[in-house]
């Protein structure tokens, strides 16, 4: 090839589920478009997925349980899917492994030698080997009981592969039940073994409901969405540890003093260039209107922050509506030019004196050089009685 010719950008595949069905889409990054391809069916509803570091395999956690504290099912698995390096197509790879209860989140460690799985009810953290043939393998025996807090929601391994962090949200208080405290459970991590847990829980975990975290790609900064308080907290990593003091606090909502319904901060992703941070705001409460339950109002949006490159402090620079209800998940393409948000359920909304339905689906945004988002299009998806729960993009 003539060295003066520009190389073709690498292809990107997007995967999104409806229940147990996981559909592959080609991603046209330049055109900000998704092209639907084939669908594979997993043993039960997709909960989360994580690619192998080689980007040739996708590990998918599934469950027949309902979300939250809903009815418990009996089918819980991790399945390996092979990613075709040319097309992105998925095919089953080997046998699935059984899990004891519903997995809510999963990741691999940095070299993809082990799979870490978070369970919410009961809260737990388990580690499974990745076999030499890339299939999921046996559980790693731990030295003792694991302190998994209350209602785990995410597990991540620090970029240096030395710590595993279990994000435990706790539960909001109700008129009849006291608040369950939240915490970040930080473990030393080596070869799949978890030891020496440290619990980061400001004020004993009261008014601290963390949901999701992400790491800066080059600096020792960690960003945590506080779901129940609608905040974004910044933590600093020092000498291989996490400083338990909150370095910076930022709002996630555009109108924090004008809450029309329950607001819940959600997914967090740092831009690949490390200059911007993105978080999801979710609302879905309903009110009666003409005998039907309709959306009560609230912020379903992506908040964009500029990151101070000397301190790590995030400053909100944009709040943009996602054009649907409850953006549970979003992801940024590896080139940092596209953001796609997934909405899990259809919702009825008022339209003057009428009622219309906003379908579930995928909203596509361009990311500008200034980090700000521009809405391009939404792909409506008929989920029937199922749920869109996870989506993500993988560079081929």
Regions found by a protein language model. Name each.
Residues 25-32, 80-88, 127-137, 186-194, ...:
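Short loop/turn segments immediately following beta-strands, especially the blade-tip
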């Amino acid at each position: 090839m003539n060295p003066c010719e520009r190389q073709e950008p690498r292809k990107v595949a997007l995967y999104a589920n409806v229940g147990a069905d996981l559909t592959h889409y080609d991603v046209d990054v330049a055109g900000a478009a998704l092209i639907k391809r084939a669908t594979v069916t997993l043993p039960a509803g997709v909960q989360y997925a994580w690619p192998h570091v080689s980007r040739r395999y996708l590990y998918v956690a599934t469950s027949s349980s309902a979300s939250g504290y809903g009815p418990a099912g009996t089918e819980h698995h991790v399945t390996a899917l092979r990613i075709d390096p040319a097309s992105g197509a998925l095919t089953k790879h080997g046998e699935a492994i059984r899990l004891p209860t519903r997995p809510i989140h999963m990741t691999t460690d940095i070299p993809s030698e082990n799979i870490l799985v978070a369970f919410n009810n009961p809260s737990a953290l388990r580690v499974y080997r990745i076999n030499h043939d890339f299939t999921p393998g046996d559980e790693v025996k731990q030295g003792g009981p694991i302190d998994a807090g209350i209602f785990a929601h995410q597990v991540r391994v620090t970029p240096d592969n030395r710590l595993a962090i279990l994000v435990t949200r706790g539960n909001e208080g109700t008129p009849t039940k006291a608040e369950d405290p939240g915490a970040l459970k930080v473990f030393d991590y080596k070869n799949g073994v978890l030891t020496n847990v440290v619990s980061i829980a400001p004020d004993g975990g009261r008014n601290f409901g963390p949901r999701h975290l992400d790491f800066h790609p080059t600096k020792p900064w960690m960003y945590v969405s506080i779901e129940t308080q609608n905040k974004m907290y910044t933590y600093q990593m020092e000498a291989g540890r996490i400083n338990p003091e909150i370095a910076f606090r930022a709002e996630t909502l555009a109108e924090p003093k004008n809450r029309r319904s329950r607001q819940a901060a959600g997914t967090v992703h740092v831009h690949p260039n490390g200059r911007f941070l993105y978080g999801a705001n979710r609302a879905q409460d309903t009110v009666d209107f003409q005998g039907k339950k309709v959306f009560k109002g609230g912020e379903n949006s992506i908040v964009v922050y500029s990151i101070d490159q000397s301190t790590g402090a995030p400053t909100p620079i944009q709040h943009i509506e996602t054009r649907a209800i409850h953006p549970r998940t979003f992801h940024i393409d590896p080139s940092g030019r596209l953001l796609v948000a997934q909405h899990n359920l259809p919702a009825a909304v008022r339209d003057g004196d009428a009622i219309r339905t906003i379908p579930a689906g995928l909203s596509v945004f361009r990311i500008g050089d200034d980090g700000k988002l521009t809405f391009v299009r939404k792909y409506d998806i008929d989920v029937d009685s199922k749920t869109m729960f996870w989506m993500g993009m993988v560079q081929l």
